[in-house]
Amino acid sequence: MIQEDNAKKYSHAERLHTFIKEVLDKAGVAQEKLDAIAVSKGPGSYTGLRIGVSAAKGLCAALDIPLIAVETLRSLSRKQNLTHNELVAPMLDARRMEVYSAIYDSEGNVIRGTEAQILDETSFTEYLDKSIVHFIGNGVEKFQEVCTHPNARFVTSELPSAAQMAGISNQKFQEGLFEDVAYFEPYYLKDFIAGKPKKK
């Protein structure tokens, strides 16, 4: 498996197609040999999702291949190895004390679907009282500030990665679970709110 990581903010629009070419070159695969393209469907950054999905749809249309969409939180949950009866709660930073989160069991089954929620000391108590819960993602630090439950485990360093999408994408490909390229839209979860323009 080959992937390209980019930690530089606000550079996706300029660099994404270059990254795609670099990954294909490293793998020795021509665009024309691709069977499908997978993309993270959200939730997440409005701009990041829009850029990624637009690029994926454009390539699928040009190459006449199917589009596979993977939930961002589901792919993030694959980064944590669980033992039986443990849960994982992938968590992405929204604004202030808000996060996007979901809960999965050790088999990858959805225990609670994706929600936007305001965090406080009682968040996730119904799950923490019964199981060890691994909180993972860039929204974890917010919850770590208010959660003192002994069953909470915090993994703050992990971000969504294309590598974790591979297994899910392959399964969807085998099952023929494709999106309509013309009409597919990212799962923003919340309406876009414009911020102040960045200073140049």
Spans of model-derived segments:
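Stable alpha-helical structural segments in soluble proteins, enriched in small hydrophobic residues
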Residues: 23-27, 62, 80, 162-173
